[in-house]
Structure formats: C-alpha cells, structure tokens
Amino acid sequence: MSKIIAINAGSSSLKFQLFEMPSEKVLTKGLVERIGLEDSIFTITVNGEKQKEITNIPDHAVAVNMLLNKLTENGIVKSLDEISGIGHRVVHGGEKFADSVLITDQVLADIEDLSELAPLHNPANIVGIKAFQEVLPNVPAVAVFDTAFHQTMPESAYLYSLPYEYYEKYGIRKYGFHGTSHKYVTERAAELLGRPLESLRLLSCHLGNGASIAAVEGGKSIDTSMGFTPLAGVTMGTRSGNIDPALIPYIMEKTGQSVEEVVNVLNKKSGMLGLTGYSSDLRDIIAKEEEGDHRAKVALDVFVSRIHKYIGSYAARMKGVDAIIFTAGIGENSAIIRERVLEGLEYMGVYFDAKRNNVFGEEAFISFPHSPVKIIVIPTDEEVMIARDVVRLGNVG
C-alpha cells in the first residue's frame, strides 16, 4: 500500500486529494482558496466531515506546509514518510510531452518554457511543484499534462490553415485540453461496455464551465474541440468558443479596446454570460428560460447547437460512433442539457431513455437497450488518473 497525493495548483488555489494505492481509496481531499490574501480558506475532509479554516496563507509554500501538517495532525498519515509519491496536474505540455513524466530539473525547465502557451496556468502549476519539492524533496513527483492525451491527433486535425512556418517557428497548432478527463471516461466506458477500447469509436463530451468534445478512436484522441488555447471550440460558461478571427480587430476598432482587453472579454465575459448578460451558470439560465426569458432560451440553443456541430463532424471523421459519453459538472448533472443534445440524433442510431436520463452525478447508461449507439454518463475522476500515473512512473505501489 502506498499513499499518493494528487495536486491541482491554480494561481491562487491548491486542490488536493490523498489516495491509498493500488486500492484507489480516497483518504482525504480538500482545497486551499484565496492564497495570497489575508482571508485565505483552507478546507479539508476528515472522516467524512469538512473542516474549514479562514487564515492568512501568503503563498503556495505556506499552503503546502499547512496541508502536510493537517495530514499528520488529523492522523491521516502517521508521518510524512508515508507519502510515497506526488502527482501534479500541468495544463500545457506542448508537443514535448505525449505522456505523463517523472519531474526532473530538465522537465521543470521545459514546463517553464511552455508557459508562454499557457500563461494563466503553467506558472501556477510550477509554483505548486516547487512548493512540494521544498518540503518533500526526495519523494518522486510526476507531471500529468492536460494536453498529452491529444498528442495522438493526426496533422489533419491539429494543423491550422495558416502559413506552415507559423507551426514550425512558433508551435502554432491545436493542442486540446481536458485530456486527463477524456482519457479517464473513455477507458471507463470500455470497461462498462465490456469491449476492448481498441475496438471503440467514442465521443466524449466534457461539459462544465469549460467544455470540450473529443473524438476517441481505438483509445486514441483523433480530434478535439479546444485548440491552441482552451478558448476555442464550443460555447462555454464565460468563453466564446470559436468565432470569426476577423472579429478581433473589428471589436478593437469599435470599442477602442486593446488586444489584451478583447481577449479578456472572449475569455471572461463571453459564452453563456455574454449571451444572457447575467449568468454563466446553466442552472440559473435554465430557471430563467422556464420564466420565459428569451435570451436564456437563445443562450441554451447556442450552447446545444455548437455541441451538435462537433458530434456530427466527429461521427463523420470516425465513420460512426459506438457510444457518446457525458461528463463534468453539466454533463454529469444536467438531464435537461443531455436531453437537448441527444434529441433528434435518431438518424445516427441514438435512442435515449428519458427515464434513465434522470440521473445526477452517477454512472449510468441512459440509452434504450436497443440503441445502436450507447449513451453513458460517467463522472470524471482526473485525480485518480494522476494517482495511477504516479504509481506507473514513480516506481511506487
């Protein structure tokens, strides 16, 4: 038995989960929020009960020390020697990393070099890695990349129709994200279907505040909706998804905003929030639609129609689909959105059962038994994938 910590470090947050491996039992989990502010929030689950503390946590190093102290204080581990591996989520691995990797000084330098591709995320991930290195320098640490799973995409999927030298010189191409989630749910789908992953054509719909669709054929990602950044693809909570690129200079001209300001609008003030004008939360928008709000209805129609574009396109790319998977916050919990996405797909062999669709946050087949295309709800578990990779690469277990 070995104890593995899975870490997801954001710019002002640190999400953690402690696993006992190989049983994959979750021993504790928690979240440090508002790092760098005087009213930081530390939450940890001990014996099924949440403990919450508001205190001053000036940086990630202090957050890590506090987390490790809480593990010993609460008897979750007797000593820090019991921790045999650490797994870090890293958003961008570029073309350099097609798999998770044991962290060395060189790997850390490479992740730093890739920060220009993910300026909001990679620097925060690096801070998390370094904070743990200071406290547990001899414990093997593994980097698990959001982009790695999509490195199997063919050139026809990842190249943009731009001058080829932009790809060669600047690495401009589609990378795709949510890879750890897409990998987990497609592997789990194969188990639930009782079929080898290598024989399956799967559509994975990761629908949360950030959303992406992936076409997974034979266990390999062959295309995905996000692009060079997580701004591309379907309409999201606050992100625009795909737009006409000529709109950017046009908006700049009309509003007097800079490139950075327009990109900020596309990232943080667009999507469902932009369309409705009041919320990025689908629950609020569905409630407003029920009250007769026109913009709520339009926003939901846009959200669903963009998902349809990818389902149709990827079904054509794979010459058919064996199963459609719904995961992440909306995919796992919104029966209404699943129903709207699936309605009208009978032409491609999709027959969903409205009764079975009435599930929230649990694994379920929601298609009729006779449906040629199976529809499965699978709660994602990126943390367990991180823990598995630590066992696989860190020589622990």
Curated annotation (Swiss-Prot):
CDD domains: ASKHA_NBD_AcK_PK. It is found in: Cytoplasm. Keywords: ATP-binding, Cytoplasm, Kinase, Magnesium, Metal-binding, Nucleotide-binding, Transferase. InterPro entries: Ac/propionate_kinase, Aliphatic_acid_kin_short-chain, Aliphatic_acid_kinase_CS, ATPase_NBD. It catalyses: acetate + ATP = acetyl phosphate + ADP. Pathway: Metabolic intermediate biosynthesis; acetyl-CoA biosynthesis; acetyl-CoA from acetate: step 1/2. Pfam families: Acetate_kinase (PF00871). The keyword S-adenosyl-L-methionine does not apply. Its cofactor is Mg(2+); Mn(2+). The record marks 178, 239 as: Transition state stabilizer. Mg(2+). Can also accept Mn(2+). It is an enzyme of class 2 (transferase). ATP binds at residues 15, 206-210, 281-283, 329-333. The active site is at residue 146. Substrate binds at residue 89. Homodimer. Catalyzes the formation of acetyl phosphate from acetate and ATP. Can also catalyze the reverse reaction. This is Acetate kinase.
